[in-house]
Regions:
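Conserved small/polar residues in nucleotide/adenosyl-binding loops
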Residues: 84-86
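Charged, low-complexity intrinsically disordered segments
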Residues: 27-35, 57, 66, 74-81
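Short Cys/His-centered divalent metal-binding micro-motifs
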Residues: 48-74
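Histidine-centered nuclease catalytic patch
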Residues: 19-51
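Alpha-helical structural motif
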Residues: 5-9, 55, 75
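Short helix-coil boundary/hinge micro-motifs
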Residues: 1-22, 64
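Generic preference for hydrophobic/aromatic residues in regular secondary structure cores
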Residues: 13, 49-50, 77-79
Length: 86
């Protein structure tokens, strides 16, 4: 079974990440793991996107929407952690 469900949220997530590669990093940015470390992602530069704080929070909300099973719990934890920084 796939980690991600194929849906509109995945497309929005993809567009946020893709946009980050098509621009210079914003003045205020946060590093985002495209494939979250909790799901097997690495710190490799190809797995990092430079997002604004708002984009970063939205990206984590989208990951929560597109994951399933035990991975959904991991993404919920990540969303809760990101609330600390707001």
């Amino acid at each position: 079974m796939s980690i991600y469900l194929s849906n509109k949220y995945l497309k929005i997530y993809y567009n946020i990440v893709k946009r980050s590669f098509d621009r210079t990093p914003p003045k205020t940015y946060e590093k985002h793991h495209i494939i979250p470390k909790a799901l097997g992602g690495t710190d490799n530069s190809k797995n990092l996107a430079y997002l604004t704080p708002k984009e970063h929070f939205i990206a984590h909300l989208l990951l929560l929407k597109i994951t399933e099973g035990s991975n959904k719990c991991k993404m919920a934890f990540a969303v809760n952690l990101s609330l600390i920084h707001i």
